[in-house]
Amino acid sequence: MNSLAQVRDLVRPDLGAVDAVIRASMKSSVDLVDQIAEHIISGGGKRMRPLIVLLAARACGYRGSGHIDAAAFIEFIHTATLLHDDVVDGSSRRRGRATANAVFGNQASVLVGDFVYSRAFQMMAAIGSQRVMEIMSEATNFDCSVHKRAYLHLK
């Protein structure tokens, strides 16, 4: 067994709970959103960001359940960023398969990226921590400024 698998084993039940929250929170009344969400979720990925959140919670002795939602909204922000980046970069493949924008089009991909961002912020608000909102707002703003500079550099 490789070391990453061993690390995952430490928080395997929590990773399952995060995946359940991700699937439930991606549900929409719009079929196209559900199709794109399934395309994204079924694409796999290592879920490194949620893993780090879960490991940090464990290392700090956290005993609640808020870390599950925190891990999910971190993954949502990452996913939204990837959806938008693939459109900006004109990417057609990620992890060996067609990107959402290649399959569903740029407009749908951007709109679902926006949907995923909005769900992330709903989940953050539900945690009820002003500090979490401040940190994540700053991080998201920083991420946007980095991508804006990268885009301007490409032009």
Where are the language model's segments positioned?
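Mg2+-dependent prenyl diphosphate-binding active-site environment of isoprenoid biosynthetic enzymes
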Residues: 16, 23-155
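N-terminal amphipathic/basic leader segments beginning at the initiator methionine
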Residues: 1-24
